């Protein structure tokens, strides 16, 4: 039966955009920002540490960050629609 692969995103900052083609062989390219010179690629979670070391050693890579998408809590507790508050009566002063 088909098993879903655990994937993780890497944000790779480059010195030059022309080097983006050299990084694509490490994973699946998701996004390339030519203006800000970074890539987002997805790799298998089990291969993360090995590929992270390999990519960090490349001379044309400025910085590599691991995506924090897995750390975000997606369970929203409570009702997102809020009821309007009823006006409260002011205490009488006298």
From Swiss-Prot:
Any one Pfam family here would be DUF2129
Establish whether keyword Transmembrane helix is in the entry: no
Q: Where is it localised?
A: Cytoplasm
Sorted alphabetically, the Gene Ontology cellular component annotations on this record are: cytoplasm
The UniProt keyword set, sorted, is: Cytoplasm
Entries under NCBIfam families matching the protein: PRK02302.1
Q: Which HAMAP family match?
A: UPF0298
User: Of which family is this protein a member?
Assistant: Belongs to the UPF0298 family.
The protein's name in its UniProt record = UPF0298 protein SZO_03600
Q: Which organism is it from?
A: Streptococcus equi subsp. zooepidemicus (strain H70)
